[in-house]
């Protein structure tokens, strides 16, 4: 089973348990704290992924590191993934959990790249248009790329909406080359 599929299954199980058990907000906050620790500690991630370190040792490590950070229910989940030899997937499980939570709440992550900085009003207008286009709440991530020459590109999941000047010039070039042939 691929790690993404397995991660999604564990994330889905935790999300379902958290919703049914009434500790969704708590689990979400605790997973966010775990993610911060994992992002800051490469060594911990390597230990969790190491095939040399046994499941009992990983369980003990997770308990030591996160005892003050997480509650009993999330700790049970951490122990479970360690026992099932899936602790190395913890960073991906957290990512998948957030994706599933966003999906359930009608939130979509969108990457907006522009050639020049956009004003707050421009960003708000674009986000409003994207929200009406997708029918979901938009969580935007802004980036700058001078190679676009002008305009913006928007990435929504696997879909890219390219309104950049660079793209328009590439299309024009293709049209001119195909006319010449």
Curated annotation (Swiss-Prot):
Task: Mark the transmembrane ranges.
Answer: none
Gene3D superfamilies for this protein: N-terminal domain of the delta subunit of the F1F0-ATP synthase (1.10.520.20)
User: Where in the cell does this protein reside?
Assistant: Cell inner membrane
Q: Which GO terms describe its molecular function?
A: proton-transporting ATP synthase activity, rotational mechanism
Tell me the membrane topology, using the record's own terms: Peripheral membrane protein
Any GO CC annotation of this UniProt entry: plasma membrane
Which terms are listed as keywords in the entry?
Answer: ATP synthesis, Cell inner membrane, Cell membrane, CF(1), Hydrogen ion transport, Ion transport, Membrane, Transport
InterPro entries for this protein: ATP_synth_OSCP/delta_N_sf, ATPase_OSCP/dsu
Keyword Membrane tagged:
yes
Extract the coiled-coil ranges from the record: none
Q: Which family does it belong to?
A: Belongs to the ATPase delta chain family.
The subunit field of the Swiss-Prot or TrEMBL record says: F-type ATPases have 2 components, F(1) - the catalytic core - and F(0) - the membrane proton channel. F(1) has five subunits: alpha(3), beta(3), gamma(1), delta(1), epsilon(1). F(0) has three main subunits: a(1), b(2) and c(10-14). The alpha and beta chains form an alternating ring which encloses part of the gamma chain. F(1) is attached to F(0) by a central stalk formed by the gamma and epsilon chains, while a peripheral stalk is formed by the delta and b chains.
Known role: F(1)F(0) ATP synthase produces ATP from ADP in the presence of a proton or sodium gradient. F-type ATPases consist of two structural domains, F(1) containing the extramembraneous catalytic core and F(0) containing the membrane proton channel, linked together by a central stalk and a peripheral stalk. During catalysis, ATP synthesis in the catalytic domain of F(1) is coupled via a rotary mechanism of the central stalk subunits to proton translocation. This protein is part of the stalk that links CF(0) to CF(1). It either transmits conformational changes from CF(0) to CF(1) or is implicated in proton conduction.
Q: What is this protein called?
A: ATP synthase subunit delta
The coding gene here is atpH
